[in-house]
Amino acid sequence: MAAQGFLLIATFLLVLMVLARPLGSGLARLINDIPLPGTAGVERILFRLPGVSDHEMNWKQYLCAILGLNMLGLAVLFFMLLGQHYLPLNPQQLPGLSWDLALNTAVNFVTNTNWQSYSGETTLSYFSQMAGLTVQNFLSAASGIAVIFAFIRAFTRQSMSTLGNAWVDLLRITLWVLVPVALLIALFLIQQGALQNFLPYQAVNTVEGAQQLLPMGPVASQEAIKMLGTNGGGFFNANSSHPFENPTALTNFVQMLAIFLIPTALCFAFGEVTGDRRQGRMLLWAMSVIFVICVGVVMWAEVQGNPHLLALGADSSINMEGKESRFGVLVSSLFAVVTTAASCGAVIAMHDSFTALGGMVPMWLMQIGEVVFGGVGSGLYGMMLFVLLAVFIAGLMIGRTPEYLGKKIDVREMKLTALAILVTPTLVLMGAALAMMTDAGRSAMLNPGPHGFSEVLYAVSSAANNNGSAFAGLSANSPFWNCLLAFCMFVGRFGVIIPVMAIAGSLVSKKSQPASSGTLPTHGPLFVGLLIGTVLLVGALTFIPALALGPVAEYLS
């Protein structure tokens, strides 16, 4: 089984790199503000109609444009969900959502989290799924990519104050990247058997003679961008373990590739735009090393079987609880690491049913900031924060002013970097503490003891880091949990974007210094090791006490 696991990982990474390389070249053109062939005329028309200016923006203007679009989207989606019963395409006559669930849902889709405190097939109409959630899947993904576009430009421009135009970037990302690729994935899913219709739910007779109501809907179109945009919110409650969303082993493989496709392509684009492709490869090596180790640990933990079942004398040579038999342990383990390394959160197995160590790894991947490939845009700018921190640490060790790609890293940048890195750990630890201190928080736990605490810790980690997956034993659809998680999602998203844009604004105004004999090389294996060590050190120091109370205590008990 070990050989099968390594072959699965190797095949996945090989196909991923082959697909991401050409996409990275296309993204590099967009970062360099070069329209794709044949698109300039369409862009001019689209900007002329609403009268949008395409002039360059400084970091504050760029940030305000991103925040303004997202706040508008949040308000529209919130009221759409409240008044769902007045809107069309609601064949099941589903009522509007409560204010707290509508708020939670609006925030989580705008922030690219897609935490779901509801069951899609019994809560949301087709109109809400399409015009509400799917639209935000595109816009939230485009927002994250636009931020990393601006951040990359900060390293390639010198003595300037502008970082591009947010509206131009958002339009190009959506029209020329997200929509075409999502369309191809959606057509493939439909060909493989995923649903795409507007029929009312179908009553069918089962082989046992009972009657069952099968949900319908425009599934494939939402499923495609859900994966490509690392959104993760399922059309159905079972998410990608549902055969109507993910019908075959081939669609499952394609969905995993879709999750990592843009984050990987952005690393290639980063190297191409900066004029040193080794920089992009350095990031990919660091991410890949952590990723492969994490997949190996989860696979090992899950093939050991469930120790609680073994203690009762049951046959549990592998842990199949909560897993689809058509996918199995190895594929489920790989998917779990893919979806939590990226800020996706889609699942084909119930993470709450993983072994203690098998469930701890996905939780820890979220807690370190979703920087191992990560979300579209957010993963790379999150990892770049650790790059700046690693450069700063190396500068202290050798007694030189830290610099990266020729840009001096001063006190202002390091303060903002520390602020951005500390946002999500603060939310996670304080949110988990608040939940455990209140009756409303503790009453949602399905399990007592360490596993119950793990459910709480996982939920807050998922929300604050904009992942969206869950230990589903937590009953999170209550005013307390909906509001707590909405706050964590909102601050976890925009509380990081704001200092990231401020760092970009500071760096773009600096001159690039030529490399000297004392410059730290940031493309070799030494720096890869330093970067991995920085990520692990920050993650270990921050979360080991909390993890010791949850999954570690469960493993040792």
Swiss-Prot record:
Role noted for this protein: Part of the high-affinity ATP-driven potassium transport (or Kdp) system, which catalyzes the hydrolysis of ATP coupled with the electrogenic transport of potassium into the cytoplasm. This subunit binds the periplasmic potassium ions and delivers the ions to the membrane domain of KdpB through an intramembrane tunnel.
Membrane spanning residue stretches: 5-25, 63-83, 132-152, 170-190, 253-273, 283-303, 329-349, 356-376, 379-399, 416-436, 484-504, 526-546
Family membership: Belongs to the KdpA family.
An MF annotation (GO) of this entry: P-type potassium transmembrane transporter activity
Membrane protein topology class: Multi-pass membrane protein
The protein's assembly and partners: The system is composed of three essential subunits: KdpA, KdpB and KdpC.
NCBIfam families in UniProt: kdpA
Assigned keywords, A-Z: Cell inner membrane, Cell membrane, Ion transport, Membrane, Potassium, Potassium transport, Transmembrane, Transmembrane helix, Transport
Protein name: Potassium-transporting ATPase potassium-binding subunit
Species in which this protein is naturally found: Shigella boydii serotype 18 (strain CDC 3083-94 / BS512)
Pfam families xrefs: KdpA (PF03814)
Gene Ontology cellular-component terms listed: plasma membrane
Keyword Isomerase assigned: no
Subcellular location: Cell inner membrane
